[in-house]
Swiss-Prot record:
GO terms of molecular function: mannitol-1-phosphate 5-dehydrogenase activity
Residues reported in the UniProt entry to bind NAD(+): A5, I6, Q7, F8, G9, G10, G11, N12, I13, G14, R15, G16
EC number of the protein: 1.1.1.17
Similarity comment: Belongs to the mannitol dehydrogenase family.
GO CC terms: cytosol
Recorded name of the encoding gene: mpdA
Superkingdom field: Eukaryota
Methyltransferase listed as a keyword: no
Catalysed reactions listed for this entry: D-mannitol 1-phosphate + NAD(+) = beta-D-fructose 6-phosphate + NADH + H(+)
Active site: K213
Gene Ontology BP, a term: mannitol catabolic process
Protein task: Catalyzes the NAD(H)-dependent interconversion of D-fructose 6-phosphate and D-mannitol 1-phosphate in the mannitol metabolic pathway.
Annotated source species: Aspergillus terreus (strain NIH 2624 / FGSC A1156)
Record's keyword terms, sorted: NAD, Oxidoreductase
Protein name (Swiss-Prot/TrEMBL): Mannitol-1-phosphate 5-dehydrogenase
Length: 388
């Protein structure tokens, strides 16, 4: 029998990042999703194209050898597939992990294979596989928890690839940045060895990769979007062509770089080169990366361990500079009532209805005695005053 991977989420990242590399590694990919239109398209289309875009041009790959299951209507089929899979991946968004966990738990529990399935969450969040693992344990029979490790191994990952808004009428085809990074922990697999997926960079300690990526790529991307939005820019590349915005992004990434260098021992010149590469990637006009797409979901992006409060809080605890990050947090607070983004409307309501103290606590999760709390509280109050 050939190798089989289950991919939860048939969206652009699922099709255009995860499935691309699973396909190239020789896996049959079984997509699991609840969106009728996505599942139907995958079931009726034998192949789709992934077009990698860089400043040097475009390269198109054809992806085939996949199936799709609607877990809303065919849960038992999805359970059977997981029970015989080699790998389970997901790209559904961190907030959806709790909804896919019961199904994955059933599939794992039904396994009779001697080799455990590899479970890898591919989300923009620190420790996403750990989070999924926790939810799966909640849905595993108590008398089976002790042997869960025999049936599944869970490895955190760090993913990095820009997937811009897609052109209209693209169908299943995906335009995506050529650059990518996919780092995954190898230690959980022990003597069984990790899955054979050449695109993955297998590492012993993932935290430096996750924090470097989240606090450089995601922080830089979102900072560009929030400054750009306030100045009426439409595309990320347009925003970075503005010298003032580019300068602000550099200042933010200088601060996160100081954290990454001091905490993880990454050489300063290596981190500087990484930052320059990231800004170069985001400046690529061929990606047509929309500012509202990058800025959406500000509540999640302002939360405690995310791209702004995460690094700023650690810098504050270490007595290091975090001024530019606080400026960026203010810009994120101003991303309100953007059409098509519910979180930006919710943000506006929180700032309108709550006191500065309550809003700061709810939005950031910071403790009132934290050294970052007061500087952020000042910005919350300022934005509330400006938007009355």
């Amino acid at each position: 029998m050939g190798k089989k991977a289950i991919q939860f989420g048939g969206g652009n990242i699922g099709r255009g990042f995860v499935a691309e590399f699973l396909h190239e590694a020789g896996y049959e990919v079984v997509f699991v999703d609840v969106m009728d239109a996505v599942v139907s398209a995958l079931q009726t289309t034998p192949s789709y194209n992934v077009t990698e875009v860089s400043k040097d041009g475009e390269n198109t790959k054809t992806i085939s050898n996949y199936r799709a299951i609607n877990s809303k209507t065919n849960e038992s089929d999805a359970v059977k597939e997981i029970a015989t899979a080699d790998v389970v991946t997901c790209a559904v968004g961190p907030n959806i992990l709790k909804f896919i966990a019961p199904l994955i738990a059933k599939g794992i529990d039904a396994r009779t294979e001697s080799k455990p399935v590899a479970v890898i969450a591919c989300e923009n969040a620190i420790g996403a596989t750990d989070t999924l693992h926790g939810f799966i344990k909640e849905h595993t029979p108590k008398d089976r928890l002790d042997t869960l490790y025999d049936r599944a191994r869970f490895a955190n990952s760090a993913i990095d690839r820009i997937v811009p808004n897609q052109p209209p009428n693209s169908g299943l085809n995906v335009r995506i940045e050529k650059f990518y990074e996919w780092a995954v922990e190898q230690t959980p697999f022990g003597s069984f060895g990790h899955p054979d997926i050449p695109a993955i960079h297998w590492v012993d300690n993932l935290e430096p990769y996750i924090e470097r990526k989240l606090f450089t790529v995601n922080t830089g991307h979102a900072t560009t979007a929030y400054y750009g939005h306030l100045r009426g820019k439409k595309m990320i590349a347009d925003a970075l062509a503005d010298d003032e915005i580019r300068s602000m992004v550099h200042k933010v990434l200088d601060e996160t770089a100081s954290l990454i260098v001091s905490k993880h021992g990454i050489p300063e010149d290596e981190q500087k080169e990484y930052v320059d590469t990231i800004i170069g990637r985001m400046s690529n006009p061929y990606l047509e990366d929309n500012i509202e797409r990058v800025g959406r979901a500000p509540l999640r992006k302002l939360s405690r361990k995310e791209r702004f409060i995460g690094p700023a809080s650690q810098l504050a605890e270490r007595g290091q500079k975090f001024d530019a990050l606080v400026d960026a947090i203010e810009m994120a607070l101003r991303f309100q009532n953007v059409p098509g983004d519910q979180e930006s409307a919710d943000l506006a309501q929180i700032l309108k209805q709550k006191s500065s103290e309550d809003a700061t606590s709810e939005l950031t999760g910071l403790e009132k005695d934290h050294p970052l709390y007061s500087p952020v509280l000042e910005r919350v109050a300022k934005v509330q005053q400006d938007t009355k």
